[in-house]
Amino acid sequence: MPARWRVAVDWLASHVQLGWASCPLTQNGCIRILSLAGHRNAQSPASVSQRLGERAAGGKHEFWPDSVSLLDAGRAQWDHVLASRQVTDVYLLALAVSHGGRLVTLDRAIGIKSVAGAQAKHLLTLG
């Protein structure tokens, strides 16, 4: 496991009891990444989907539907979005803000100024 991923896995293990959320985008991403043929412990999409579903059903999980749009007037602060690779994290931060949650990421390029209403409590950058 890459060292960067280890940071995220360790953080989740020590905080999962506080609760966690997922949305269609993160669920699909999880299934995609963990079933990649090049992934060290790759499993079939069906297996990853089943395991993710079991963990989500195990409690402390909240499902956040795709209920925001970056096209909503004023939601994304586009002058603070500097590259296309930031768009997904900007969306996830906007979703976290709308649900009163927090985006935990390894990506240092995302900032709270990129989403209207975002505060430090809505974003945690690991590593």
Question: Can you describe what each PLM-predicted range is?
Answer:
Residues 1-22, 34-50, 115-118:
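Short, well-structured N-terminal submotif of metal-dependent ribonuclease cores
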Residues 16, 56, 97:
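Anion (oxyanion) recognition and catalysis
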Residues 19, 60-62, 121-122:
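Conserved beta-strand segments of alpha/beta enzyme cores
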Residues 24-28, 49-81:
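Acidic catalytic patch
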Residues 26, 88-89:
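Catalytic-loop motifs flanking and including active-site residues across diverse enzymes
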Residues 69-82, 90-127:
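Acidic, PIN/NYN-like endoribonuclease modules and their adjacent C-terminal/linker elements
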